[in-house]
Regions:
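Helix-to-loop junction immediately C-terminal to a conserved catalytic motif
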Residues: 54
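Conserved ABC ATPase "signature" region
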Residues: 115-133
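Conserved ABC ATPase signature
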Residues: 138-142, 146
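Catalytic Walker B motif of ABC-type/P-loop ATPase nucleotide-binding domains
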Residues: 163-165, 170-173
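H-loop/switch region of ABC-family ATPase nucleotide-binding domains
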Residues: 206-207
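A short, surface-exposed alpha-helical micro-motif characterized by mixed small hydrophobic
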Residues: 212-214
Length: 261
């Protein structure tokens, strides 16, 4: 695989639903090891970006490169897909499988791994997120918070069948949505710990200021299908840019109108 200092590169990335332009000629780069937050009001297309990066949908126009390789097919149609790991807003666990089977799903594809080794790897990943002795339980036997932790443990699993040996790209879709401040802090810690353990690059989509500020190095502001602002997290905290100021302070007055939000 071609080496690149960029985990992600997009050129004029666009997607339309019928006549509606959801994303309009987006250009950005994510360097190896960087942590990016994509922010903006609901319905601005943030989660759509993650779905494109994860290979769940294809852009209508433009170019996407992950770890230097052009992405032209859905992930399931690729012979040598990149190591992209998506943590959904909801845990997305398979209810009929045990926690060990959910977390170790990718490992079971590798016939060179024994059941004993898979068990050890899964338990190690569960321990990294503070879960012990839950591997034989079903998802509905765990609390919502514990299920969320399981989804983070799953993001620590490396698919050894991948031919590419790049560092992973971790995608977090609204990881703290609807959580109280204490629970949000715990999840933010999990995001940072998962990033450190996986030693990759990450993109977080969030509306929560503490999540944005604690889990990212730089920020992109998305509105109306276009990036309206880009800068470091420190610049985001201090910027008087009208889009950033309105988002940060929850103002009704500004370029993002309530009827659109």
């Amino acid at each position: 695989m071609k080496k690149s200092k960029h985990a992600v590169e997009t050129k004029n990335l666009s997607i339309s639903w019928g006549e509606v332009n959801v994303l309009d000629q987006l250009n950005f780069e994510l360097n190896d090891g960087e942590k990016l937050a994509i922010v903006g009001p609901s319905g601005s297309g943030k989660s759509t970006i993650l779905k494109i990066l994860a290979g769940l949908i294809l852009p209508t126009k433009g170019e996407l490169r992950i770890f230097g390789e052009k992405q032209s097919y859905l992930r399931l149609d690729q012979n040598n897909p990149p190591d992209v790991r998506l943590v959904f807003q909801n845990p997305a666990l398979l209810g009929s499988l045990t926690i060990e089977e959910n977390v170790g799903f990718l490992l079971r594809k590798n016939k060179n791994l024994s059941k004993k080794l898979i068990h050890e790897i899964v338990c190690e990943c569960l321990a990294e997120v503070g879960l012990f002795n839950v591997e034989n339980k079903l998802p509905n036997e765990l609390s919502g918070g514990m299920q969320k932790r399981v989804s983070f443990a799953r993001a620590l699993i490396t698919d050894e069948t991948l031919k590419s040996k790049t560092k992973p790209l971790l995608l977090f879709d609204e990881p703290t949505a609807g959580l109280d401040p204490i629970a949000s802090t715990r999840i933010e810690d999990l995001i940072n710990n998962t990033n450190d353990k996986a030693n990759g690059s990450s993109i977080v989509v969030s509306h929560v200021l503490s999540t944005i500020e604690r889990t990212s190095d730089k920020v992109l502001m998305l509105y109306g299908g276009k990036f309206r602002w880009a800068g470091s997290i420190n610049e985001f905290k201090e910027s008087n840019d009208p889009y950033v100021f309105q988002f940060r302070h929850g103002k009704l007055d500004g370029p993002m109108q309530p009827k659109d939000i």
